Amino acid sequence: MRRWNRLWDVVLGVIVSLLCAFPVSAREKVILDSDMVEGFDDGVAMLALAQSPGIKLIGVTIVAGNTWVSDGVAYALRQLEIAGQNIPVAAGVDRPFRPQRYELFGLERQLFGMGHDAWVGAFGYPKPESWQKVYRERYGKEPQSRPDPRHAVDFIIEEVRKHPGELTIAEIGPCSNLALAVLKAPDIVPLIK
């Protein structure tokens, strides 16, 4: 019986050694483009991507939608800090892509009503002064990290070019950052996975 146990140990050791000798398949590279909120769908998606062993979250780009960009940047930074993740967060487009969409939103609601859902996201409250002010007021402390200095549009362009054919962009907010990136650098379109 001991002989079989010893043989089994050797066989398992050889299998583990062989598995370790081959490189693990590359992790899927992803940029998350989001109108970030605390927790809920966007925050949960970000943390799931950040902590998934099969994913390398290259960065998080923030766009106005459910929240203003300043709010989204503060929320993303704080959630990543709590999770112990050092992932770039880049501020992006803070107005709807369609001309005068923000300015005409009040009139649109008067003419057509609110529909089944009264939630209007960033359109429903004043734009914050800065992400730092949002962070301090919301969390009562100084931020431990800072957003990436690049605009989200430039972040997307540069990262796609750096990882041609390898990068997935997960859009879970308005697509304004990606739309402007494509308009600014149409060469990236075939490079996105």
Regions found by a protein language model. Give the residues of each.
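Bacterial N-terminal signal peptides
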Residues: 9-21
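N-terminal secretory signal peptides that target proteins for export/translocation
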Residues: 1-8
